[in-house]
């Protein structure tokens, strides 16, 4: 487990507290304390909004969280997104990754990385293929949905030579991005909430960086992947 994976959520909670939009703001986690099932104990408000800080409506958000919070039973396929618990109202929101603003967020990241790392020269978007990298899992088909939606929305804008999905655990795999297109210039945007294990370690290694080098770079405070890196005749 990468300890940095919870940092963005904790920072977001601090920012929301500073804005005074809600009476209370608290965090709960799957693998860290406080746990998801402790949500009601963490605040005293009568109405509690529970927002998954995840990208897609997948196995975790549609089965694990609802079950732990009592919105659904283990064998229940559907559930209501609000419930009463000891005279308090719990409202289960949809993941932040499904919000309409995510398209502009992804495009902003894609443009920024090219501007920051133009060597040997900044390629035109019309000669660049953009990959949106997600997790993917056979446990729940919705895990792909957020990535596929963004791929189509960005493709419709016609800025890039092509826009393609890539996944950790499903086809098309991240490691196959170099053979997925004839274009030389590639940009890959990890569609993950945090710079955790997948974004910082798994993806660089899947793209061809040796594990020892990735670990060494991270230990010294460097990015695991150096932009741009040439691999298999492509510049990513």
For the regions a protein language model found, what residue spans apply to each?
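Active-site-proximal alpha-helix that buttresses catalytic centers in soluble enzyme cores
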Residues: 1-236
